[in-house]
Amino acid sequence: MAVSTVSSFLLPSFGIPSSSPSSTRLKVSLLPSSSTHGGLSSCVLTKPSVSLTKVFAVPDTLDPTPEILDEPASEVPSSSSISVDADKMAPKQKIRIKLRSYWVPLIEDSCKQILDAARNTNAKTMGPVPLPTKKRIYCVLKSPHVHKDARFHFEIRTHQRMIDILYPTAQTIDSLMQLDLPAGVDVEVKL
């Protein structure tokens, strides 16, 4: 726990002329910290001939107290404990599977088969995450020769899903290879 204190000091509110160095001498007085100031120490800078001053607040240098450093909870974690935490956060290896299909029931059935195969081998899965559907629109003239105002619009919608398999084993990869997915589903696998 860091302790911060704020000290305030008073500066003259006038410009100091550079022509007379003897008259620009400032008087500095330091007041000790007390309970009436709420733990604040103050420093007063005044010029003897002028009494106009401005107050500014400045943080003191933070010196940790010895009681804080002696506590066992304030130890710096070792590099081995940091690497163990990093291993828990991000897996070393994952399989990312992207599925594409023109028909939603086919892609949903394929996702279910992949998730069942991965979960049977005790691999952690994330997904299926629906990705944005891509629409390709084709504009075709209705008439064979003239009448350009009459047109057909055809579209092809490509539905996509993404599945991540974390911490895969050889058994997981083997069970994924044995799957018989429908021909209308495009499968892209990244290791």
Swiss-Prot record:
Gene3D superfamilies: Ribosomal protein S10 domain (3.30.70.600). Keywords: Chloroplast, Plastid, Ribonucleoprotein, Ribosomal protein, Transit peptide. Residues 1-56 form a transit peptide. GO terms for biological process: translation. GO terms for cellular component: chloroplast; chloroplast stroma; cytosol; ribonucleoprotein complex; ribosome. GO terms for molecular function: mRNA binding; structural constituent of ribosome. It comes from the Eukaryota. It is found in: Plastid, Chloroplast. Pfam families: Ribosomal_S10. The keyword Ubl conjugation does not apply. Part of the 30S ribosomal subunit. NCBIfam families: PRK00596.1 (NF001861), rpsJ_bact (TIGR01049). PANTHER family: 30S RIBOSOMAL PROTEIN S10 FAMILY MEMBER. Belongs to the universal ribosomal protein uS10 family. This is Small ribosomal subunit protein uS10c. It comes from Arabidopsis thaliana.
